Amino acid sequence: MAHPLKHAESSARRFGGKADDYLGIHNWFDESKSFFADFRHRALRHHAEGIFLAERIFGVTIVNSDGKRIPVRYVGEQHVKEDLGRIPTAQDRLSQISPQRWMYGQRFEGITSKTQPSGL
């Protein structure tokens, strides 16, 4: 889906209440679009760990405008599935990163080919 509002409208159809009941959660999932405006923004929160983080931030449940308690995890799962078709793990994402020298967090002065980490 292209916009958090569309996710929120989908949540309202699925769980009841109004789109505004869910918009904060969906805005949070897509917040990274503000600094990385293509599909790769999803690497930060669109995975199982992101769903559990949303639950820690927003609480285990929210109460929608119909007075129903809705698990935040269900809303997060819906968002990620609508965007990706499944719920990946953070490991699924991170394992696809091509390590770069700067990512190791240390300087490699004096490293020889025998001691250099593989892939560098």
Predicted regions and their residues:
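N-terminal membrane-targeting hydrophobic helices
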Residues: M1-L120
